[in-house]
Curated annotation (Swiss-Prot):
GO terms for cellular component: cytoplasm. It comes from Dechloromonas aromatica (strain RCB). Its EC number is 3.5.1.5. PANTHER family: UREASE. This is Urease subunit gamma. It catalyses: urea + 2 H2O + H(+) = hydrogencarbonate + 2 NH4(+). One of its GO terms (molecular function) is nickel cation binding. It is found in: Cytoplasm.
Length: 100
């Protein structure tokens, strides 16, 4: 199977997001890469499902709370930018203050 660099990046994000999801389900607090991966993965999946950029910008702030992440992690992530593939093309989704 031949994958482009972009496809490899998407698979890596999905894998990291899945790991973060499993750790969160176990009750573990997420670290920086896990938190970013979980939010990024959710945005990418939402885009694939046909949600709008505005819907995803809002949804990105509802995924994690400060209680879900290790101390200080929320302050390390002032925004997350995701280049996601929508049914009508690729768009940049920016989520400001994703962890509330």
């Amino acid at each position: 199977m031949e994958l482009t660099p972009r496809e490899k990046d998407k698979l890596l994000i999905f894998t990291a997001g899945l790991l973060a999801e499993r750790r969160q389900a176990k009750g573990l607090k997420l670290n920086y890469p896990e938190a970013v991966a979980l939010i990024t993965c959710a945005i990418m999946e939402g885009a694939r499902e046909g949600k709008t950029v505005a819907e995803l910008m809002h949804a990105g702030t509802q995924i994690l709370t400060r209680a879900d992440v290790m101390d200080g992690i929320a302050e390390l992530i002032p925004e997350i930018q995701v280049e996601a593939t929508f049914p009508d093309g690729t768009k940049l989704v920016t989520v400001h203050n994703p962890i509330v």
